């Protein structure tokens, strides 16, 4: 691993297959739960997000009111290019995961089946990270933020049969 040294904090930019335990609530998409096995993208380092930032002190408390959340969050969701799809698969079985990410968007596939397509994928360089942990995070549009560790009651593991990373201009 090569780390690039100390840097200022950055706004979230991610494109991933991600599992959040029931203790998590990272709700990026209006219609997708904040936990579970997902395909997702987010890019808060975009001009629309910066333009919307001055409204946060008013918008975040208002989103605690369900009708306001339904009205306001889609604007925020578009601004941070958040897209998610819950994956209805057995995580303990072998699967082939594919992520095609280009300048015009991204497509996520599981076992060859398209599970998420977006035209607003993160721009710029990102690193490949694969991990397993026992952390839980809460980060909601209505202002709930928290972090904790979750006790592990049984062995945890991640198995990879093959990994291929290719770079291509699209």
Question: What are the language-model segments listed below?
Answer:
Residues 1-70:
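Secretory/extracellular carbohydrate-interaction modules
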Residues 6, 20-22, 33, 104, ...:
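Generic structural motif
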Residues 36-49, 71-96:
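Short, aromatic/His-centered strand-loop micro-motif at the edge of beta-sheets
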Residues 93-101, 106-108:
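Short tryptophan-centered beta-strand motifs in secreted/extracellular beta-sheet-rich domains
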Residues 109-113:
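Short strand-turn-strand beta-turns centered on an Asx-Gly dipeptide
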Residues 120-121:
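Residue-level structural signal for beta-strand termini and adjacent loop
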Residues 124-170:
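Ligand-recognition surfaces built from glycine- and aromatic
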């Amino acid at each position: 691993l090569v780390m690039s040294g100390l840097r200022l904090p950055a706004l979230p930019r991610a494109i991933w297959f991600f599992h959040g335990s029931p203790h998590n609530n990272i709700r990026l998409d209006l219609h997708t739960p904040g936990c579970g096995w997902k395909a997702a993208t987010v890019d808060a380092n975009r001009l629309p997000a910066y333009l919307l930032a001055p409204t946060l002190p008013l918008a975040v408390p208002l989103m605690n009111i369900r009708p306001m959340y339904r009205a306001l969050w889609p604007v925020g969701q578009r601004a941070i290019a958040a897209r998610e799809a819950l994956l209805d698969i057995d995580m303990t079985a072998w699967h082939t995961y594919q992520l095609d990410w280009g300048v015009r968007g991204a497509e996520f596939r599981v076992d060859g089946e398209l599970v998420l397509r977006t035209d607003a994928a993160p721009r710029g360089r990102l690193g490949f990270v694969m991990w397993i942990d026992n952390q839980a995070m809460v980060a909601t549009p209505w202002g709930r933020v928290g972090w904790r560790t979750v006790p592990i009651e049984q062995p945890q593991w991640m198995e990879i049969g093959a990994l291929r990373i290719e770079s291509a201009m699209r």
